[in-house]
């Protein structure tokens, strides 16, 4: 008879302990251990693949340049690095209602319409509910198969029986293995189901996408090892009330990371935004103080976006600082640079900094744009509307060079910008001919003289 024992798992990293601990010794997080009942059976997750296990000389290993499977959605193909790799396991995470299932249904439709067999496995909806949602997207071919199940063994058998080229698991937190006594969505269940799906994908050369729920902190629910096990991790960002959605690749074994795809949620599903820069700048106010346009590199794609700042005298004892779409601590740091190195009296002012369009950016190249937006609002002097700004700012007020200067300038020139304020070091590196007026600055003081 199988024996049951009580173990404790860290919900962040999956570390296992025989007793509860306040702090995880592996990831150093506090209050993350959860209790689970585990049946002592043969260990799963370590089964060998069908390929030979004998060591080989690396020079004898042949690499086949297999053609990727195009999804029919160019923005998704860009994030994946050119399409879906056969035998890969990908994780799609995001807030509820953000559009994860809608996007994967659209991928299934495109693949089925191109005569590729597709299996959509749902543990959250009935076939009738999926059909209702699918009709909003469009017509589906016979190659699209639906299966509503949560048992791991039944799901594995269905995949091996139908042998699809592409399979979707929606969602990983609803699936369970009968070999474990813990509930679906627990650390051990998520880890076991993911390991089983990885074996199925690799052994049968099937591309598998799994949908993952996120916690209130914005990370995929379950152990951190989940993201280490899969080949690709994609995150859907954006507010449910906003029109635009950002698909960001944070891990990709077959392409570059930090690539983004931009979508707009419409009545018939997600629609690609082919020119995000132009879309993000629509409706931008002209001749307004506190408004600047910056260029940020998201992966290999330059994106132009507006930063707005509002600085006004405070009526509170402690001035308010608010940042939307930009790191709050970074804004405070840059305001300290303005006070110390430039002499702006911001200690008695409220400051609000907003990134238009619902985007989130963390690249240091937008530092100079943030500083100029704050100074423009403080002095109530607008920056010329045909000006683009980028550059990293240090604590002593210097403006440092950033990568991708030529790509940023080309993107700005396409959209009709005439002037670019950038680090002097970048001006010296640019070799391409451009009609834009390049204004190089070495420190914050030189930049603010241009307002």
Regions found by a protein language model. Give the residues of each.
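Conserved Walker A/P-loop ATP-binding site and its immediately adjacent core
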Residues: 123-129
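Conserved RecA-like ASCE P-loop NTPase motor core of nucleic-acid helicases/translocases
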Residues: 118-122
